[in-house]
């Protein structure tokens, strides 16, 4: 889910892109799932540097290719390892100018602990005043935007706990896809949003989005497709208001070839297992 938030309170200097992203396995998306093939560096959790100027709520930190990944003390380090894997792989696949735009816009990611809510996240606290919706019940993740560049996700989804309300899909990939679109691509490729809109309107007119979450707007249309691309979306044999039969990259190619072609400009056709979630919708190890 993507919510346009009101303002950014985060001030930090732009960081440099980690050079490990330029390896062939990362840039070309060669098939494989091992850490060696992904070239993922060790995930070392530390305290956030003072230079980030973060709220005191955040006491854990990892740098992911120039993007801060943060949380309170309640989030286990294992969640950082899993989220770092996902985010490192995705950012290494991005065009350098897209990732650079995200870094300069101060994009960052926060992990909510299992027993924390959306409004516990400092940047999202103001949502407690929304009398139309209980955000702590509604959302276990929000996508970053230029106005509020923080993306949030939840421990139970990152680690694929059985109690996760979104157990059949990866919400971090969905929400970070919003940040890629609404921050990186909006800045680095000004025509991307219009091209995405054209794909969305065509798919909507064809009726293939009916009774699914994809039809909400072009932002959700994109984020759901990115989940498909990495084989981490939920699947239903018939549309149920949220999902349908399309939940993998292979199926997306048949379901919406125009959108597939657009995504192929930004993500490699990879079989990397970058999530605790698998396309069979079964919880599994890497």
Protein language model regions, located:
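Bacterial N-terminal signal peptides that target proteins for export
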Residues: 1-10
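C-terminal motif of bacterial Sec signal peptides marking the signal peptidase cleavage site
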Residues: 19-20
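Short, conserved catalytic or interaction motifs in soluble domains
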Residues: 23
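N-terminal export/targeting leaders of redox proteins
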Residues: 26-30
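Acidic/polar, low-complexity intrinsically disordered N-terminal segments immediately downstream
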Residues: 31-37
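Acidic/His-rich structured neighborhood in mature extracellular/periplasmic domains
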Residues: 38-43, 49-59, 64-67, 72, ...
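Metalloprotease/metallohydrolase-associated module, dominated by Zn2+-dependent proteases
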Residues: 51-56, 70, 129-162, 196-286
């Amino acid at each position: 889910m993507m919510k346009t938030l009101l303002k950014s309170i985060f001030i930090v200097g732009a960081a440099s892109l980690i050079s490990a992203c330029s390896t062939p396995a990362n840039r070309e998306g060669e098939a494989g799932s091992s850490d060696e093939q992904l070239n993922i560096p060790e995930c070392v959790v530390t305290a956030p540097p003072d230079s980030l100027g973060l709220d005191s709520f955040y006491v854990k930190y990892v740098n992911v290719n120039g993007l801060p990944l943060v949380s309170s003390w309640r989030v286990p380090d294992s969640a950082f390892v899993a989220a770092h894997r996902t985010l490192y792989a995705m950012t290494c696949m991005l065009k350098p100018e897209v990732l650079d735009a995200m870094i300069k816009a101060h994009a960052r990611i926060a992990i909510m602990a299992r027993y924390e809510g959306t409004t516990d996240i400092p940047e999202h606290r103001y949502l407690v005043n929304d009398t139309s919706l209980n955000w702590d019940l509604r959302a276990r993740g929000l996508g970053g935007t230029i106005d509020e560049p923080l993306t949030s996700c939840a421990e139970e989804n990152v680690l694929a706990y059985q109690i996760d309300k979104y157990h059949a899909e990866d919400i971090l990939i969905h929400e970070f896809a919003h940040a890629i679109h609404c921050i990186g691509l909006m800045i680095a490729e000004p025509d991307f949003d219009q091209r995405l809109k054209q794909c969305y309107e065509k798919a909507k007119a064809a009726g293939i989005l009916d009774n699914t979450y994809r039809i909400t707007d072009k932002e959700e249309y994109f984020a759901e497709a990115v989940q498909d691309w990495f084989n981490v979306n939920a699947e239903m044999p018939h549309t149920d208001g949220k999902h349908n039969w399309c939940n993998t990259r292979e199926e997306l190619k048949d379901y919406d070839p125009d959108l597939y072609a657009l995504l192929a400009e930004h993500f490699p056709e990879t079989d990397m297992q970058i999530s605790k979630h698998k396309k069979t919708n079964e919880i599994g190890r890497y």
